[in-house]
Each structure stands twice: as C-alpha cells, then as structure tokens.
Amino acid sequence: MRMLHDLFHDFLEKPGQTYQRIVQIFGPIGSGKSCTAYRFGIEFEKEAKTRKIPLEVVHVSCKVGIDSRYALYQTVLQKVAPEIASRGYSANEMLRQLVNHLRNTPKYLLLTLDDVDYLIRTSKEKKEEGGVVFDLTRLNEMFLGEYQQVVGVIFIARDSSFKKMLDPSEVSTLGNVVIKMPSYESAQLKDILKERVDIAFRAGALEDQIVEFVAELSAGKSYNPGDCRFALDILLTSGLIADAELADYVTIEHVRKATSESFDGISTEDLMALDEHVMLTLIGSAQALSFYKTPYVSIKDVYEYYRMACEGREIQPLSYSKIKEYIKDLHFRGIINHHPQKGISIVGASVEDLSRVLQTIERSRELDKEEE
C-alpha cells in the first residue's frame, strides 16, 4: 500500500498538474491484491477530501456483470455521473462523456479494474475494435498536451499472462510500473483471520486455536501456499456447516469437514456470489456428471438436469441459449471446464465434493430467507 501512496502522492500535492499513472498489480489467489487496492482507494479518497480535492475513486470487479467495454463504461459512468449514464451512448461515446464530465465538473477519477484478465478473456467484442487497455491507457490522446482528470488506472490480475491476448501497442502503453504481491505467511494470516472473525462471528463462536490451525493449514498448502482467500473460505464454510447443524460454535470437526469440501480454483465465496440460475446451471452440471459417470457431459445433458433442478425447486427454467451463456461464464470463472468437442467437466474438485458444497450453500440461503 505504501508503494501505491508513493506513486500517486504527487497528485495530492499538485492536483490538476500531474499526468495519468498506469499501475499493474499481480499476485496469486489470496495474496491480498483486491483488498490492498480497495483499501488504498478509500484512504486516498479520504486524504483528498481533507485537502478539499474533488476526487472520486471507483473500484470495479470485472467478474461481476462486466463482459464488454460497454458494460464497464456504463458501470463507471453510473458511479461518477448517474444523470447521464442512462442515455443511449456507444462504448466510445460513454468514455468520451465520462472524460468531458470530469473536465467540466471539474473533478478527478482514480479507476481500479479488478480481475481485468477475466474481462479481457471474456470480452464479446472483436479484437480489431480495441479494448479497455487500449482505451484507458491512451486517454491523454483525447486532449494532447493537457493534464488528465483521470489520475490513474490500476489493473489487477493474477499474473501477466493476459498480456498475450493484447496487441504489442497495448502492452507497451501499460508501462512497467508493476507491484507484485507475495503470498502470506502463517503469522500474517493469523492476524488477518482474527480481525475477520471479530467482525463476522459472534463472540465465543470461534476459538483462537482454531484460527491458528486454519492459518497454518493455508500457509502449509502444497499448491499456492499462504492463500488468504483459501483460509477465509475455510472459516466461511466452517461457519456454514456449523449453522446447518444448528451448532452454538465452530469446532475443529467443522473445520475438517470444510477442508474436505474445499478445492483449489473455486472458493465458496465465489460460489455464494453466483445468482440463482447460474447456481442451478452448476448444480445441473454436477448432477449430469454424477449420473453419467463420464469425464464430460454435453450442454444438452446439463440443460436437462438444470430443468429438473428448477422443477424440484418450483422455479421457472430459462431458455437453452441462456444456459449456454451461463456455462461459458462458469468456464471463464474457472469453476467448470467447457471443451468445444468433449463437453463439460468439473475442475479443481470431485463432483461429490462440489455437490456437498452447493447443498451447504443452498441450505445457508434457505436459513437466511427464514430469518428474514
């Protein structure tokens, strides 16, 4: 976080007299990339406010409903200038409207694109039309020789492999300002987990020795050791299991069960964020694979089991074409594998383990509805 402060601090000293900064943040799953950038944004915006600098920090998760330049710019415009966001602009027009709004207001913008690699991989637009990297790193070309209202753009990704999908000209505009986030050590994980437990669990529901056990478990993983997301996922799943069993507190057995139901590449947090029909599509995939006992099943098979899952829950099923879109989305999220010739398979987990986790999440959602 100190490096981010150093990179952008001159803006606070000379607002309106600095050029746009492009920063890349890379790090493995659970290394704190998103949290660090988000926390920095809050502190930076707060510091600007104390200096009476009109700065707005926008943090966009590209995994949540962002599949194109249009969707991205509409989201940013809705946060910065909602009064003009609903008009029928194209993606290019929206970007220009955003910049003009910032110039005319006037105010400044610091934009963070989290999981930008996901957006680049899933973008529906043709490569020759350009992309977000091309657009956002060349804003200075709109008003040559002038300082920018967009203070900077922070691109967050797991690694630099997404650059292989960019044109050489786009890669060069990204520059060389890169922050690499290492994985956490056991002691660091323990401190983070304790802080989260104090917020998410009621007092006495989870003992310190269990927190320490989960921290050591995550730090000692053979794959991606020090994964904070994995550790938080274990605590979340442990809590869900304890809730489902109507237990008063989380025990080591709940943690062991949670560990047996966890797998690399898919987090319970990611699964819980899926909307109803995407979740049912995943349930249909697991049930089809379980029934046929084959490495792959067809989209047609998944759709049939998706329909049955809907009927069993008295939910109106969506169209076949819509489920195909959801399958593509699940594939890009790394939750399933969709092979054009072979079909659909589950990655990072056994079908049985995934089914158990999905059942736990469904039960948790039911309990939440009952409490409402």
Segments from the language model and where they lie:
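Walker A/P-loop nucleotide-binding motif
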Residues: G16-R39
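Short alpha-helical segments that sit at the start of domains
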Residues: D264-K293
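Pre-Walker A adenine-sensing motif
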Residues: M3-G16
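Conserved C-terminal helix/linker of AAA+ ATPases
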Residues: I241-I266
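Mid-core helix/loop region of P-loop NTP-binding domains shared across ATPases and GTPases
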Residues: Q17, P54-E56, V64-I192, F201-S218, ...
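Terminal-proximal interaction/regulatory segments of ATP-powered molecular machines
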Residues: L289, K293-E372
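Conserved catalytic segments around the Walker B and adjacent sensor/switch elements
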Residues: Q24, E47-V64
